[in-house]
Design a protein with these regions (language model features):
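RNA pseudouridine synthases
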Residues: 1-340
Length: 340
């Protein structure tokens, strides 16, 4: 008999989902048969598989050692070298907040949030490497749950990324992202003078082939599969022909802020996809800026009295501006005290 005690990383998922991860070489039909015959029990009782697991639950498998080893793939532990390599090699990543369920990471520009190719090292690998190095998780925990980033930033956008340490934490973060109860604010510098707050609405279409997007003012002009987008921006400072903006990302679509502002004639400084090429060349020459100035600087959590997000209920977290961003603001005289 094998006893599997549910830890905080596994809690919150259905029993059948857990069994498929714990026994990856077992077929779905076989697992349900074992549940019906009570060869697999939950807390000493017969189970159907749809039960939601809680921390401390006991799953017993009445198999021979040989059968269990074959079904679980024992001896074929996951290769964690990429996680450890990412943790050693990816620089300037900092932890803004961490508890038993979630982390908030500050990602520098130039680091992928998730892999684009199998050989890539991303923030996702760094996260698991960090947790392994801190002994917050064990290698064996990865058999049933992988901690993961829950929102994505473009490679060359810096700032706050929400991450789930446990399944319950990941599910809660995904929920508040989906229902938009978590508020996300960005800082950027755009071309042109913007003197008042504005709300932009439109429809965004992504060309998967070129990984670019196009913004349309209304659905009548947009392709059928275009997505509704909403962006709210407020000028924080204006100097010369540049504006420092605080942008609330109401909907979170690919390249939304970059494309939406560019569509109004206010492209982001340094944006090579949607920006002003002449201006970008000047920024490269004068400030060695080779990417868009866009920073996910603030996250505001909704009020939640209980559950995995209770410790961050109603809290606001800020990520400091990258050095290059702050340097350019000073050079352009774009301080929050500048007249708007």
């Amino acid at each position: 008999m094998q006893l599997l005690t549910i830890g905080k990383n596994q809690a919150g998922q259905r029993l059948d989902k857990f069994l498929k991860k714990a026994l990856p070489n077992a077929g779905t039909g076989f697992l349900y048969k074992m549940l019906r015959k009570k060869n697999i029990t939950l807390n000493g009782k017969k189970a159907e598989g749809k039960e939601i697991l809680a921390q401390g639950d006991e799953v017993k498998c009445f198999f021979s050692e040989e059968t269990y080893a074959s079904l679980s793939g024992a001896g074929a532990a996951e290769d964690t070298s990429d996680y450890r390599k990412a943790y050693r090699s990816l620089k300037d990543i900092s932890v803004l907040y961490e508890d038993e369920n979630i982390l908030l990471l500050n990602k520098p520009a130039g680091v992928l949030t998730q892999k684009a190719k199998p050989e890539d090292l991303s923030l996702n690998e760094w996260l698991i490497g960090h947790l392994l190095a801190a002994a917050a998780i064990k290698e064996t925990d990865l058999a049933t749950f992988h901690p993961s980033v829950c929102n994505r930033l473009d490679r060359n956008t810096s700032g706050i990324v929400l991450c789930g340490k446990t399944l319950a934490g990941s599910q809660a973060l995904s929920r508040i992202i989906k229902d938009r109860s978590v508020k996300k604010y960005y800082q950027t510098v755009c071309k042109g003078k913007i003197l008042q707050e504005s709300t932009l609405e439109g429809y965004l279409y992504k060309d998967e082939r070129t990984n670019t997007v196009q913004v349309f003012p209304d659905m009548a002009e947009a392709p059928e599969d275009a997505s509704f987008i909403k962006t709210i921006y407020t000028p924080s400072a204006v100097a010369g022909e540049y504006t420092l903006l605080t942008v609330e990302l109401v909907t979170g679509k690919t390249h939304q802020i970059r494309a939406h502002l560019a569509s109004t004639g206010h492209p982001l400084l340094g944006d090579t996809k949607y920006g002003d090429n002449k201006l970008n060349r000047r920024m490269q020459s004068e400030y060695s800026l080779h990417h868009q100035l866009l920073h996910a600087g603030r996250v505001c959590f909704p009020e939640e009295a209980e559950g995995p997000l209770a410790k961050v209920s109603g809290q606001t977290f800020d990520a400091p501006l990258p050095h290059k961003f702050a340097e350019i603001l000073q050079a352009l005289n774009l301080t929050p005290d500048s007249a708007c």
